[in-house]
C-alpha cells in the first residue's frame, strides 16, 4: 500500500482491524457497479486472489441463476473456494456460498430505480425494432398493464425491476406483500453491505470499514458513465409513471437506502467525515496524476477500450503507472487480463502438484447438487 493513503478503518479505531481478502459482489446492471468492480479487481490482482470467472466475457450466469457448473474447470483453485466474485450473474444464494470462502463479505449496490431504468433503456437499446420498438417517452405513455406485458430483452437479461431480477427475484412477487417482506428479510441476512449509487463516497467509506482496506484500495474513477447529452430529461409525471412500473425496485431501494443511513449513523460522525474527505482528496490526487483527458470509450485502445461510444473513458498521462492504468481500464479488458493471469497461475500450481504426485493438482469442486 502507499504510505500516505491513510490508516485502515474500523469504526473509530483505525488500527485495530485486519484486512479481509474475500468478497462476493452482486454486480447489478446500470447501478455504478462497474466502478465498484474496478476496485475489487484491483485489490484481487494486487494480492493474487482467485476470481469467479466464466470462459469468456463478463458474465457467469444470467438470466438463469448462478450455478457452480458455469465456472470452467481451469479456473478452479485446488481448495474449491474462490476469493472474489465481481462479475455479472443472477443471484442464487446457496450456489454462491458453495464457491465462496466461508468468511467472504457480501456486498451489492442499488440505484434510484428511475435513473437506473433510464440508463438501461438507452444503453441496452430497448428502443430498437427487435426489442421494444419505441422511445422512452412512448414507453412512459403506455398504460401500466402494457408496460408490464413487454418481455425482457437480451435473451431475458434486461427489463423492468432489473435490480430485483439481478437479486434473483421475479418482479411479479410485488403483488404479494408476504413475498416482498420475505425478500427484504432474506437480503438483509445475506448482505453485509448494500451500497447506494447516489451515495458512492459514503458507501465506499463503509466498504472500507467492512474490508479493513486502505484509501487507495477504495479510490476510484467512475466507470461506464454515459455522456450527459445521452440522458433523457424526465418530468415529475414521467418519474411517477416509472415508479409505478418499477414498484419492486422502489421497495428495495427505499429499504436499503434507509439501512445504509443507519449504518452511517453508527459510525462516529467525526471519523466518518474525515474518511469521506480523505477519499475525495485521494480521488482528486489520482485524477490529476493519471488523467490527461476524458474521451469516448470506444476511441481508446488496448485494455482502456470500451465496447460502446456511449460511455466515457480516460486518456492517461502514463500508461506504465500500475495504479493509473488499472483505474483507467475498461471492464472487458481488465477481466481478460485477470482471466489470463489466473489461467497461468492455476496451470503452474497444477504442474507443481503433479510433480509432487498430488493428484495432478485437480481442483476440488463442490459436490454436485442433488
Regions found by a protein language model. Give the residues of each.
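PAPS-dependent sulfotransferase catalytic domain
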Residues: 11, 57-109, 115-219, 271, ...
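A short, charged/proline- and glycine-enriched loop
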Residues: 17-23, 102-103
Amino acid at each position: 500500500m502507499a504510505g500516505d493513503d491513510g490508516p485502515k478503518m474500523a469504526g473509530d479505531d483505525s488500527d485495530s482491524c485486519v484486512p479481509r481478502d474475500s468478497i462476493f459482489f452482486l454486480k447489478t446492471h446500470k447501478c455504478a457497479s462497474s466502478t465498484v468492480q474496478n476496485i475489487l479487481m484491483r485489490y484481487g490482482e494486487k494480492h493474487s486472489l482467485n476470481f469467479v470467472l466464466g470462459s469468456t466475457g463478463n458474465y457467469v450466469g444470467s438470466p438463469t441463476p448462478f450455478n457452480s457448473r458455469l465456472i470452467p474447470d481451469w479456473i478452479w483453485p485446488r481448495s474449491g473456494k474462490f476469493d472474489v466474485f465481481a462479475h455479472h450473474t443472477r443471484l442464487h444464494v446457496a450456489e454462491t456460498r458453495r464457491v465462496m470462502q466461508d468468511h467472504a463479505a457480501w456486498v451489492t449496490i442499488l440505484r434510484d430505480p428511475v435513473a437506473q431504468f433510464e440508463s438501461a433503456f438507452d444503453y441496452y437499446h430497448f428502443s430498437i425494432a427487435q426489442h421494444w420498438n419505441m422511445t422512452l417517452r412512448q414507453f412512459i405513455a403506455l398504460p401500466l398493464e402494457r408496460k408490464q406485458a413487454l418481455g425482457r430483452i437480451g435473451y431475458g437479461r434486461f427489463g423492468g425491476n432489473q435490480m430485483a431480477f439481478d437479486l434473483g427475484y421475479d418482479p411479479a412477487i410485488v403483488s404479494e406483500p408476504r413475498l416482498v417482506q420475505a425478500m427484504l428479510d432474506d437480503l438483509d441476512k445475506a448482505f453485509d453491505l448494500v451500497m447506494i449509487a447516489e451515495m458512492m463516497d459514503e458507501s465506499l467509506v463503509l466498504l472500507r470499514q467492512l474490508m479493513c482496506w486502505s484509501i487507495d484500495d477504495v479510490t476510484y474513477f467512475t466507470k461506464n458513465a454515459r455522456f450527459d447529452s445521452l440522458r433523457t430529461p424526465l418530468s415529475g409525471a414521467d418519474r411517477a409513471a416509472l415508479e409505478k412500473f418499477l414498484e419492486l425496485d422502489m421497495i428495495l431501494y427505499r429499504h436499503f437506502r434507509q439501512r445504509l443511513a443507519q449504518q452511517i449513523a453508527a459510525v462516529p460522525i467525526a471519523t466518518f467525515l474525515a474518511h469521506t474527505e480523505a477519499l475525495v482528496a485521494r480521488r482528486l490526487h489520482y485524477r490529476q496524476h493519471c488523467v490527461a483527458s476524458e474521451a469516448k470509450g470506444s476511441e481508446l485502445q488496448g485494455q482502456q477500450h470500451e465496447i460502446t461510444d456511449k460511455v466515457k473513458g480516460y486518456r492517461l498521462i502514463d500508461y506504465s503507472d500500475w495504479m493509473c492504468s488499472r483505474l483507467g481500464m475498461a471492464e472487458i479488458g481488465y477481466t481478460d487480463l485477470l482471466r489470463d493471469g489466473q489461467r497461468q497461475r492455476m496451470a503452474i500450481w497444477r504442474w507443481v502438484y503433479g510433480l509432487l504426485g498430488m493428484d495432478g493438482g485437480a481442483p476440488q469442486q463442490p459436490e454436485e447438487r442433488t
